[in-house]
A protein has these predicted regions:
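Active-site nucleophile and cofactor-binding loops and adjacent substrate-binding regions
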Residues: 14-20
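Thiamine diphosphate
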Residues: 1, 6, 21, 25, ...
Protein backbone atom coordinates (compact mmCIF):
# COMPACT_ATOMS: atom_id res chain seq x y z
CA UNK A 1 0.00 0.00 0.00
CA UNK A 2 2.87 2.53 0.30
CA UNK A 3 3.13 2.45 -3.50
CA UNK A 4 -0.55 3.44 -3.78
CA UNK A 5 0.16 6.42 -1.55
CA UNK A 6 3.20 7.25 -3.66
CA UNK A 7 1.45 7.06 -7.01
CA UNK A 8 -2.16 8.14 -6.49
CA UNK A 9 -2.82 11.59 -7.92
CA UNK A 10 -4.49 14.05 -5.54
CA UNK A 11 -3.57 11.96 -2.50
CA UNK A 12 -0.89 12.90 -0.01
CA UNK A 13 0.29 9.86 1.93
CA UNK A 14 2.10 9.77 5.26
CA UNK A 15 3.42 6.92 7.37
CA UNK A 16 4.48 8.28 10.75
CA UNK A 17 6.28 6.08 13.26
CA UNK A 18 5.81 8.24 16.34
CA UNK A 19 2.80 10.04 17.80
CA UNK A 20 4.55 13.43 17.75
CA UNK A 21 5.09 12.98 14.01
CA UNK A 22 1.40 12.15 13.66
CA UNK A 23 0.46 15.33 15.55
CA UNK A 24 2.51 17.49 13.15
CA UNK A 25 0.99 15.69 10.17
CA UNK A 26 -2.56 16.12 11.54
CA UNK A 27 -2.06 19.87 11.90
CA UNK A 28 -0.93 20.16 8.29
CA UNK A 29 -3.57 17.72 7.02
CA UNK A 30 -6.55 19.58 8.45
CA UNK A 31 -5.44 22.73 6.64
CA UNK A 32 -4.59 20.85 3.43
CA UNK A 33 -7.91 19.03 3.06
CA UNK A 34 -9.83 22.30 3.53
CA UNK A 35 -7.69 24.38 1.17
CA UNK A 36 -9.08 25.27 -2.26
CA UNK A 37 -6.04 23.63 -3.87
CA UNK A 38 -5.78 20.87 -1.25
CA UNK A 39 -6.57 17.21 -1.55
CA UNK A 40 -7.04 13.97 0.30
CA UNK A 41 -4.63 12.73 2.95
CA UNK A 42 -3.86 9.05 3.48
CA UNK A 43 -2.39 8.04 6.84
CA UNK A 44 -0.80 4.60 6.86
CA UNK A 45 -0.86 3.69 10.54
CA UNK A 46 0.11 0.54 12.39
CA UNK A 47 -1.42 -1.25 15.35
CA UNK A 48 2.10 -2.20 16.43
CA UNK A 49 3.01 -0.71 19.79
CA UNK A 50 6.20 1.38 19.61
CA UNK A 51 8.21 2.99 22.37
CA UNK A 52 7.72 6.71 21.91
CA UNK A 53 10.60 9.16 22.25
CA UNK A 54 10.38 11.87 24.88
CA UNK A 55 11.21 15.00 22.92
CA UNK A 56 10.02 18.46 22.08
CA UNK A 57 10.00 18.86 18.32
CA UNK A 58 11.35 22.13 17.00
CA UNK A 59 9.38 24.04 14.39
CA UNK A 60 12.05 23.03 11.86
CA UNK A 61 11.66 19.33 12.65
CA UNK A 62 7.86 19.57 12.47
CA UNK A 63 8.21 21.20 9.04
CA UNK A 64 10.61 18.47 7.91
CA UNK A 65 8.16 15.80 9.09
CA UNK A 66 5.45 17.36 6.93
CA UNK A 67 7.89 17.78 4.03
CA UNK A 68 8.54 14.04 4.14
CA UNK A 69 11.54 13.25 6.31
CA UNK A 70 14.07 14.21 8.95
CA UNK A 71 17.24 12.90 10.56
CA UNK A 72 16.54 11.02 13.79
CA UNK A 73 20.31 10.49 14.04
CA UNK A 74 22.09 12.98 11.78
CA UNK A 75 25.13 11.71 9.91
CA UNK A 76 28.53 13.27 10.34
CA UNK A 77 29.76 15.16 7.26
CA UNK A 78 31.03 12.68 4.69
CA UNK A 79 29.33 9.71 6.35
CA UNK A 80 29.65 6.41 4.50
CA UNK A 81 26.21 5.04 5.32
CA UNK A 82 22.65 5.99 6.19
CA UNK A 83 19.68 3.89 7.15
CA UNK A 84 16.48 5.26 5.62
CA UNK A 85 13.39 3.95 7.43
CA UNK A 86 9.66 4.53 7.27
CA UNK A 87 6.82 3.57 9.60
CA UNK A 88 6.72 0.97 12.36
CA UNK A 89 10.00 -0.69 11.36
CA UNK A 90 11.69 2.28 13.00
CA UNK A 91 12.33 0.12 16.08
CA UNK A 92 14.48 -2.27 14.06
CA UNK A 93 16.13 0.62 12.23
CA UNK A 94 17.12 2.27 15.54
CA UNK A 95 18.56 -1.02 16.80
CA UNK A 96 20.46 -1.56 13.54
CA UNK A 97 21.79 1.98 13.65
CA UNK A 98 23.06 1.52 17.20
CA UNK A 99 24.97 -1.57 16.09
CA UNK A 100 26.27 -0.10 12.84
CA UNK A 101 27.77 3.05 14.36
CA UNK A 102 30.18 0.82 16.27
CA UNK A 103 31.72 -0.21 12.93
CA UNK A 104 30.79 2.80 10.80
CA UNK A 105 31.01 5.88 13.02
CA UNK A 106 28.95 8.81 11.79
CA UNK A 107 26.29 6.74 10.02
CA UNK A 108 22.90 8.45 10.00
CA UNK A 109 19.31 7.35 10.53
CA UNK A 110 16.79 9.11 8.30
CA UNK A 111 13.06 8.81 9.07
CA UNK A 112 10.79 9.08 6.02
CA UNK A 113 7.28 10.20 6.89
CA UNK A 114 6.10 10.74 3.30
CA UNK A 115 7.94 9.16 0.37
CA UNK A 116 5.50 10.85 -2.01
CA UNK A 117 6.07 14.39 -0.77
CA UNK A 118 9.83 13.86 -0.95
CA UNK A 119 9.62 12.38 -4.44
CA UNK A 120 7.20 14.99 -5.80
CA UNK A 121 9.41 17.83 -4.53
CA UNK A 122 12.54 16.21 -5.98
CA UNK A 123 10.97 15.49 -9.39
CA UNK A 124 9.64 19.05 -9.58
CA UNK A 125 13.15 20.29 -8.82
CA UNK A 126 14.69 18.05 -11.48
CA UNK A 127 12.15 19.22 -14.06
CA UNK A 128 12.76 22.88 -13.19
CA UNK A 129 16.56 22.73 -12.90
CA UNK A 130 16.64 23.20 -9.14
CA UNK A 131 16.93 19.67 -7.78
CA UNK A 132 19.61 20.78 -5.30
CA UNK A 133 16.88 22.67 -3.40
CA UNK A 134 14.66 19.62 -3.00
CA UNK A 135 14.16 18.55 0.61
CA UNK A 136 15.45 15.03 -0.04
CA UNK A 137 18.57 16.42 -1.72
CA UNK A 138 19.28 18.66 1.27
CA UNK A 139 18.72 15.73 3.63
CA UNK A 140 21.24 13.54 1.78
CA UNK A 141 23.78 16.34 1.25
CA UNK A 142 25.92 15.56 4.35
CA UNK A 143 26.64 12.04 3.08
CA UNK A 144 29.73 11.08 1.13
CA UNK A 145 29.16 10.86 -2.64
CA UNK A 146 30.16 7.20 -2.27
CA UNK A 147 27.82 6.55 0.65
CA UNK A 148 25.49 3.61 0.74
CA UNK A 149 21.83 3.76 1.72
CA UNK A 150 19.88 0.94 3.33
CA UNK A 151 16.16 1.62 2.91
CA UNK A 152 13.61 -0.27 4.99
CA UNK A 153 9.83 -0.24 5.37
CA UNK A 154 7.01 -2.74 5.86
CA UNK A 155 5.94 -2.32 2.26
CA UNK A 156 7.38 -2.80 -1.20
CA UNK A 157 11.10 -1.88 -1.31
CA UNK A 158 10.66 0.18 -4.48
CA UNK A 159 8.82 2.78 -2.37
CA UNK A 160 12.19 4.03 -1.11
CA UNK A 161 14.60 2.53 -3.68
CA UNK A 162 14.50 5.74 -5.75
CA UNK A 163 16.55 7.50 -3.04
CA UNK A 164 19.67 6.26 -4.85
CA UNK A 165 18.78 8.42 -7.86
CA UNK A 166 18.82 11.65 -5.87
CA UNK A 167 22.60 11.86 -5.44
CA UNK A 168 23.71 8.60 -7.08
CA UNK A 169 24.17 6.72 -3.83
CA UNK A 170 24.23 2.94 -3.76
CA UNK A 171 21.00 1.52 -2.34
CA UNK A 172 20.11 -1.74 -0.62
CA UNK A 173 16.29 -1.59 -0.60
CA UNK A 174 14.61 -3.80 1.99
CA UNK A 175 10.91 -4.43 2.47
CA UNK A 176 8.07 -6.78 1.64
CA UNK A 177 7.99 -7.65 -2.05
CA UNK A 178 5.42 -10.45 -1.76
CA UNK A 179 2.61 -11.18 0.66
Amino acid sequence: TPLIGLGQSGLTAFEPAYVDELAAIFRWSFEHIQADDGGAVYLRLSTRSLNQPTRDLSAETRAQIVDGGYWLEPPTPGAELAIVASGPVITEAVEAHQQIVEDIPGAGLLVVTSPGRLQDDWIEGVNNGRSERAHVRRLLAPLSPDAGLVTILDGHPSTLAWFGSVARHRVAPLGVSRF
